[in-house]
Amino acid sequence: MSLKKSPFFELRSGSVDTLLFTVKTTDLDALRTELVKRFEATPEFFADDVVAIDVRRLADGERVELADIRQMLNDVRMRPVGVVALATQGWAGEAGLPLLEARDRRVSAAKPDEAEPAPVVADAVAAATTAEPAPEPAPTQISAGGQTLVIDRPLRSGQQIYAKGDLVVLAPVSHGAEIIAEGNIHIYAPLRGRALAGVHGNHDARIFCTCLEPELISIAGIYRTTENPLPADILGKAVQIRLEEEKLMIEPLRLT
């Protein structure tokens, strides 16, 4: 093999962070029912996120059909990219998904049943609909039905805000943070994470932002990601985003 550097591509070692979907049961019917139930209220919460299937919490001798779990995750618009398993779970490599090495250091090889559990996607979704804001970190805050929710603190990576009415954000939304509203979203600061308005099909919802640098924007399920770069005349600028004939329209805002 030639070691000459190619001007067209490059292979390098690297790492990519993903969500872990931790399987704690072999009852796939119950798992499917719970997964659908959790995603009904916020179907876009983890839409298009990559996820690794973590089977380390299963008891010795237990196994699941990973192909079925893969399909479940696809059905809720998540993208399984691999499996995290213990060395004794050789069957995990039979599903056609690569075996991944988790870096969370939360499962002890000697006594996995006593280890702190790895992140669970289903638990994270539950937080989107049931949790009270926690001081450190505060993963989710939810407004009362129909009321405007005002957030005046910066949102860090991994934090999520859900508003049942309109949402007003007065501080930066960092990469990896997510703001979701059933109504309009107003962001008077840089948006570098995700903003999803009109999540229950409100096509009249809009997003207003004074500095647009997003990972994802969405209205009523119609979304745009950074895979489709924003034009220079709106990137980092004040804009409004609305729907017109099922297309996202991003228009400059004249603030003076």
From Swiss-Prot:
InterPro entries: CAP/MinC_C, MinC, MinC_C_sf, MinC_N, Septum_form_inhib_MinC_C. It holds the Pfam family MinC_N. GO terms for biological process: cell morphogenesis; division septum assembly; regulation of cell division; regulation of cell septum assembly. Keywords: Cell cycle, Cell division, Septation. Belongs to the MinC family. Cell division inhibitor that blocks the formation of polar Z ring septums. Rapidly oscillates between the poles of the cell to destabilize FtsZ filaments that have formed before they mature into polar Z rings. Prevents FtsZ polymerization. Interacts with MinD and FtsZ. PANTHER family: SEPTUM SITE-DETERMINING PROTEIN MINC (PTHR34108:SF1). This is Probable septum site-determining protein MinC. It comes from Burkholderia ambifaria (strain MC40-6).
